[in-house]
Amino acid sequence: MTDKTILERSLGLFNLEKVDRDIFSWTGKNVGYKRIFGGQVMAQTLIAAYKTIDVEHYAHSFHSYFLRPGNMDKSITFTVDRIRDGKSFTTRRVRAIQGGEAIFNCSISFKVKEKGLSHQAEMPNISGPDDLESESEMRKRIKNKIDKKFHSIWLREREIEMRQVEPIDYLNPCLLYTSPSPRDDEL
């Protein structure tokens, strides 16, 4: 599968059809998984909410609840409640419904871009992407540490290329931090 078809397949997960005012639908498209992963339905609810607001607003707060597992083979209906439409702030509540039951619920606040305080750490001096090993290169390099029955999953092409500045050895877990309880001596 080429990079283009992987990306096109992934982007297809986010094409929502307008059913009515504030109601959108996504037709299930199985891409090899039985269940819908959280990031997908979160992105879809955010897209549904964005379709009901002015473009000058951007999401600045997102609170959500995963209620039930979703099924990739079934369509999802997204209902958007317009809680508030203000000059600076807009609020939406979105429910993702599958088979008549909510699988995901969220509340999203949008804000107009305004000048304000900015708290940001200075960018550290790190290697550029071309100097780092890609995740696919790393997976190929250590595939012999993985049981062969998992090679197809381990080595499958990914939609997004990751390059870690400080690579983590996922196959050699270790405790990075621990501390005693403040009242450890009383236990």
What are these regions (language model features)?
Residues 177-187:
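Single conserved hydrophobic/aromatic residue that forms the stacking wall/gate
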Residues 1-179:
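Terminal targeting signals and extreme-terminal segments of soluble enzymes
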